[in-house]
């Protein structure tokens, strides 16, 4: 992975303007598309498979007038007056008439109409006008809402409007978010001591979140998207976008201060720090996509949107950022004697830095440190046990808004439960006395404990359903309301048996309770799945069992602390006024979102810190010095990254939406605790106690897991091999003690352009050697350069420069003709290789076979002409070998590896066929012939030296 990222970084650096323009065009396309499609977010929470949602769906089909969007105009009489006073009553009737004339209004029910029920408060100070709208909440346009609100202007009585349609679902930024970005910029400037270096992470992050915002707006045009989704994606995209770029720029600046070439430094920074970024980002994505397992659509969209933001941040860090580094070039090199330059020198010399002093203090008292951290964080987690979950309603709207004012007026005048009534649907298809049965059902519902009032049953036009509005005594977000819903559902069975009318409990409040229950039940499975997958990924990254387990268990303390502080502030009300909020239940999906995001981000710091420790342990084998040195190298940049994330998240708390505030506070606290207390304090303490056991991994697991090379060991080897390859002069192929798989054979050879080389070994070893030179099999050791491609790190390039030819034709089907073989190879050959030979048609095939016959005759390799219709398998061994070897030249590669079948060709025949191959391929092509031991006798002595040491054969054969 590190080598691949190194190449990506190098290409992006060299083609900086192309990469930058591509990203800017992508940003313009995303934002333009999102705005053009006009997507709007919404707060339509739904949860398929629950009783409340199924009842709503049934209501929408059978009683659309009751299932559509609705609003309430709340009229408050002036002080000392009553809504029943003639003047106020006339004004209410006039208001109802004005409302009924608005486009998009289906019906209006005034408080004094014949079928009105409970729309005037007991003290007659407040009245409600019910407004039924056409379509769902998402389908009601702003023009209709503005017209509704305008009807309340210039009246003697105060008029406020309530209803889900008035909830603010716009996505906007406030001054506090801008301040958060400015504080992040200040941290970057202090970290780098350079405006240019500090600006690059901000640029990549802002471009990334712009693309994400455009994508989410476009998505909102075709499917429901919660208003929290873009805010969550924005918050996470900014945080990880800045952090990921920070790690790479920090590595780049350190390398520049130590004298590395800027282009090479950018590529190396992307290959090393970028590897940690990629795998840290993958853990975040895994955690966020884990929200899909919960099975709640709006939550799945939030998870996918946030995961997309992380993916874009990763892509920006490894492509856009090196392009910016390329544009700035050598101007980013710290001046000699500057703070950045001195810091880089101190790190190289293992000087006493703040990070080194801190970790030494932790390592001196690991037991005391562990106990202290667990006790403190455990105490902060205590409020989590009183967690109360619910969905937002009118009471969570901003203070002073018309929907919040109306909600408070209804709750105060009619009772808290009236502000969020339950809907009870009754199937009346089997009843014969509808009105009496509805009265009986109403009476039974009113007798349920906790019910304040029940409206008269209203049958649907087709007499399939009837609905009752049930107002609990308590508010929608009161825990007692959950008990009322449960008791209503328990009572439904008895009512059904008495009246033959199945009942369902639904409505916004019931849906919210069902969602909260589903989310609470999903927390443990979600945590197990996400933690399990991430532990497996970290096991592959760190090659350890205990380190990933330690990281996952520490995460539980992080989540507990984040949730505990959020409960204390938003549920208990501690310091709520400082954050411009009020005490109430916690947003029902906040804990699972917090778990997903915090887990991913917590693993970020684990990867960034522990990968440095792993790198030092691999280099030195000393676990204590690995902890100290690895921590010292990563502490400064992790500190800066954590501070940036903290300030970005904290910026959404004071003036953010009520939906996002508790999430933002939980994330800000969780990030600070995780980075500074868990990863930088508890982590080194536990690693010290574990010692060498921290890096234990069973051999079976080690063999089964892929080598992800986060530490960049393979990249270091690759760079060393590139330097070695540059020292090989004009050699086309050089193999330096390549250890072949599944054998003890070691291959060493050197060939100039036009050389012929013989590999002398048994058939199996020859094939292994050919596949290794062509990059298809990795060598167990050694190094090689094949036509400019370094092995083993550039196996893909090597495979395009080498053609493997089995001149025995053992793998051909019996029915393959010579013409089919040539046409197939011509069709697959690169365009440059086909130049002058025509396309893969019959005429070009015949011409090529004629040329082959001419060359074979000239070099004494002919045993008769070969026609296009001849079956290859039926040709004599010599003719078949000639044809197959010649066909191998059609690939146009600079190296041919040809394997001669044991005993099928005499040395003189190999010489003759080789001359034909050289004539077809060109004098500069290297031909590597694989022959059996003893078959080299009599070969042309002009051949270059080939040396194959094969301990299985216990022989060394060399020839010239």
Describe the residue ranges of each PLM region.
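Membrane-embedded transmembrane helical bundles of large multi-pass transporters/channels
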Residues: 1-39, 105, 136-389, 500, ...
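Glycine-rich P-loop/Walker A and Walker A-like loops and their local beta1-loop-alpha1 context
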Residues: 743, 753-778
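Conserved ABC transporter NBD signature motif
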Residues: 779-791, 798
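Q-loop/switch helix immediately C-terminal to the Walker
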Residues: 808, 813-859, 884
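GG-anchored amphipathic helix commonly corresponding to the ABC/SMC/Rad50 NBD signature/C-loop
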Residues: 865-868, 877-897
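Conserved N-terminal strand/loop that marks the beginning of ABC ATPase nucleotide-binding domains
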Residues: 727-742
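Structured non-transmembrane domains adjacent to transmembrane bundles in polytopic membrane proteins
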Residues: 49-70, 79-163, 386-572
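Conserved catalytic loops of ABC-family nucleotide-binding domains
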Residues: 283, 892, 904-940
């Amino acid at each position: 992975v590190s080598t691949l990222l190194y190449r990506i970084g190098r290409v992006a650096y060299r083609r900086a303007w192309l990469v930058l323009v591509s990203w800017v065009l992508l940003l313009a396309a995303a934002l333009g598309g999102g705005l053009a499609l006009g997507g709007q977010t919404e707060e339509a929470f739904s949860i398929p498979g629950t009783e409340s949602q199924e009842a709503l769906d049934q209501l929408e089909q059978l009683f659309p007038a009751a299932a559509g969007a609705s609003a309430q105009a709340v009229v408050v009489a002036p002080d000392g007056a009553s809504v029943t006073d003639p003047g106020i009553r006339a004004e209410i009737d006039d208001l109802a008439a004005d409302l009924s004339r608005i486009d998009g209004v289906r019906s209006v029910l005034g408080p004094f109409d014949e079928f009105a029920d409970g729309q005037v408060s007991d003290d007659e100070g407040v009245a409600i006008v019910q407004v039924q709208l056409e379509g769902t909440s998402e389908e009601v346009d702003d023009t209709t809402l503005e017209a509704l609100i305008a009807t309340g202007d210039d009246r003697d009585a105060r008029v406020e409007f309530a209803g889900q349609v008035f909830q603010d679902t716009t996505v906007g930024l406030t001054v506090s978010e801008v301040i958060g970005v400015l504080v992040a910029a200040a941290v970057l400037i202090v970290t780098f001591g350079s405006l240019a270096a500090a600006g690059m992470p901000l640029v990549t992050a802002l471009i990334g979140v712009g693309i994400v915002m455009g994508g989410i707006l476009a998505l909102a045009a075709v499917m429901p998207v919660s208003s929290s989704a873009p805010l969550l994606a924005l918050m996470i995209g900014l945080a990880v976008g800045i952090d990921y770029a920070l790690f790479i720029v920090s590595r780049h600046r350190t390398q520049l201060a130590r004298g590395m070439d800027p282009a090479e430094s950018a590529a190396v920074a992307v290959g090393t720090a970028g590897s940690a970024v990629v795998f840290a980002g993958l853990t975040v994505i895994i955690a966020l996509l884990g929200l899909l397992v919960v099975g709640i659509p709006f939550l799945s969209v939030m998870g996918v949107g946030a995961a997309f933001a992380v993916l874009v941040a990763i892509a920006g860090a490894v492509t856009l950022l090196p392009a910016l580094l390329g544009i700035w070039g050598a101007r980013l090199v710290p001046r000699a004697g500057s703070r950045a330059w001195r810091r880089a020198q101190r790190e190289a010399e293992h000087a006493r830095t703040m990070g080194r002093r801190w970790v030494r203090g932790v390592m001196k008292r690991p037991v005391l440190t562990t106990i202290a951290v667990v006790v403190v964080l455990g105490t902060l987690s205590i409020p989590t046990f009183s967690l109360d979950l619910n969905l937002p309603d009118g009471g969570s709207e901003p203070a002073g808004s018309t929907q919040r004012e109306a909600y408070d007026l209804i709750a105060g005048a009619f009772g808290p439960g009236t502000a969020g009534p339950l809907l009870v649907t009754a199937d009346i298809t089997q009843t014969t006395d509808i009105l009496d049965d509805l009265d009986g059902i109403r009476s039974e519902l009113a007798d349920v404990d906790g019910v304040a009032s029940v409206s008269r049953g209203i049958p649907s036009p087709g007499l399939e359903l009837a609905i009752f509005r049930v107002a609990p005594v308590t508010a929608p977000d009161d825990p007692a309301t959950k008990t009322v819903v449960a008791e209503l559902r328990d009572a439904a069975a008895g009512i059904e048996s008495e009246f033959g009318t199945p009942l369902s409990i639904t409505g916004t409040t019931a849906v919210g309770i069902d969602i909260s229950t589903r989310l609470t039940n999903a927390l443990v499975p979600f945590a197990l799945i996400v933690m399990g997958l991430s532990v497996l990924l970290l096991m592959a990254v760190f090659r350890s069992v205990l380190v990933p387990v330690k990281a996952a268990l520490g995460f539980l303390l992080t989540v507990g602390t984040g949730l505990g502080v959020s409960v204390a502030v938003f549920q208990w009300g501690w310091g709520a006024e400082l954050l411009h909020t009020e005490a109430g239940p916690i947003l029902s999906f906040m804990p699972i979102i917090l778990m997903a995001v915090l887990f991913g981000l917590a693993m970020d710091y684990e990867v960034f810190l522990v990968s440095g420790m792993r790198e030092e342990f691999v280099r030195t084998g000393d676990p204590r010095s690995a902890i100290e040195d690895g921590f010292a190298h990563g502490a400064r940049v992790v500190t800066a990254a954590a501070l940036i994330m903290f300030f970005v998240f904290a910026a959404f708390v004071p003036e953010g939406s009520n939906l996002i505030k508790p999430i933002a506070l939980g994330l800000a606290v969780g990030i600070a605790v995780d980075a500074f207390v868990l990863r930088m304090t508890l982590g080194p303490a536990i690693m010290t106690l574990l010692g060498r056991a921290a890096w234990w991994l069973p051999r079976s697991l080690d063999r089964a897991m892929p080598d992800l090379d986060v530490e960049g060991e393979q990249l270091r080897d690759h760079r060393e091999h590139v330097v070695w390859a540059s020292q090989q002069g004009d050699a086309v192929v050089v193999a330096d003690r390549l250890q072949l798989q599944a054998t003890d054979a070691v291959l060493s050879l050197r060939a100039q352009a036009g050389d012929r080389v013989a590999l002398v070994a048994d058939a199996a070893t020859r094939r292994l050697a050919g596949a290794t030179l062509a990059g298809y099999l990795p060598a167990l050791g050694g190094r090689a350069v094949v036509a400019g491609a370094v092995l083993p790190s550039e196996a893909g390039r090597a495979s395009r420069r080498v053609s493997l030819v089995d001149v025995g034709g053992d793998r051909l089907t019996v029915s393959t003709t010579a013409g089919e073989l040539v046409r197939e190879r011509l069709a697959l050959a690169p365009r440059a290789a086909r130049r002058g030979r025509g396309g893969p048609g019959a005429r070009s095939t015949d011409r090529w076979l004629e040329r082959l016959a001419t060359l074979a005759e000239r070099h004494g390799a002919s045993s008769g002409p070969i026609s296009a219709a001849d079956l290859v398998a039926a040709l004599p061994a010599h003719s078949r070998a000639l044809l197959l070897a010649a066909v191998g030249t059609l690939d146009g590669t600079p190296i041919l590896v040809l394997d001669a079948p044991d005993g099928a060709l005499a040395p003189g025949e190999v010489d003759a066929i080789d001359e034909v191959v050289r004539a077809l391929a060109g004098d500069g092509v290297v031909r590597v012939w694989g022959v059996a031991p003893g078959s080299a006798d009599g070969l042309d002595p002009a051949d270059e030296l080939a040396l194959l040491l094969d301990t299985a054969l216990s022989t060394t054969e060399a020839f010239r």
